[in-house]
């Protein structure tokens, strides 16, 4: 099979059209015929081996029928601010970096999960290359993190170090071996290893996941008490025959 394929449309208008209020009947029209493609087990043996060996969440859907950053906001904060009271509603990728690196100048101002973890005394860190994270770290859109990144007076420098700093997989392994792995860690892959169609491929994504597993299993005692979630923020636009569950319409 062709490993490196181009992505399909996966933004708010085309995703809403493909979903079609749950009918799921307009996928090729909204996202091109390419959206009906798929891989067999022989094409992606590493991913199938993981699925066979570990728990597979086979009812795993996007939180919102749109693109990357909105769904990452749901994962990292629990909302996209649908009422628009704190910089939302977020339906696109406008806030996927700090303003000095091209992000939208307006801040998101609601509270993220990592801030709640910190206030509860739970340790956390983001492992990433801030210069090459495929703009997939949603913390870069939030006022408190942007202020810390810019070194603003009164900002909390810990938010920059833990949330918007650079600590890659070698740092993850070092932390495992030194016994200082946080209680909660987020790992953001570089573009080439993100498994995202276009810049990456299933083979490259498999290699990155294998490196994460190698780091976590470097200390068997750490691995024994670790839960690893391998997560995708959305479907890129490739077809899923199962309609996602939705809340009742307010209308």
Language-model segments: which ranges?
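N-terminal pro-sequences and low-complexity stem/linker regions of secreted or lumenal proteins
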Residues: 1-251
């Amino acid at each position: 099979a062709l490993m490196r394929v181009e992505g399909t449309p996966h933004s708010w208008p085309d995703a809403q059209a493909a979903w079609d209020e749950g009918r799921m009947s307009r996928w090729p029209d909204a996202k091109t015929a390419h959206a009906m493609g798929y891989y067999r087990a022989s094409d992606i043996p590493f991913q199938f081996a993981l699925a066979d060996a570990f728990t597979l969440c086979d009812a795993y859907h996007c939180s919102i029928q749109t693109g990357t950053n909105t769904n990452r906001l749901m994962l990292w904060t629990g909302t996209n601010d649908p009422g628009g009271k704190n910089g939302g509603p977020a339906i696109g990728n406008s806030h996927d970096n700090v303003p000095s690196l091209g992000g939208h100048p307006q801040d998101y101002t609601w509270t993220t999960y990592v801030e709640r973890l910190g206030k509860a005394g739970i340790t956390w860190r983001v492992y990433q290359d801030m210069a090459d994270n495929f703009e997939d770290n949603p913390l870069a859109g939030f006022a408190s993190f942007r202020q810390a990144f810019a070194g603003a007076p009164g900002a909390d420098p810990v938010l920059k170090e833990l949330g918007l700093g650079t600590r890659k997989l070698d740092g993850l392994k070092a932390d495992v071996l030194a016994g200082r792995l946080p209680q909660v860690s987020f790992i953001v892959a570089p573009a080439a290893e993100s498994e995202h169609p276009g810049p990456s491929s299933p083979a490259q994504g498999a290699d990155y996941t294998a490196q994460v597993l190698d780091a976590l299993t470097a200390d068997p005692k750490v691995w024994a008490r670790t839960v690893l979630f391998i997560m995708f923020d959305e479907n890129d636009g490739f077809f899923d025959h199962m309609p996602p569950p939705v809340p009742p319409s307010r209308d």
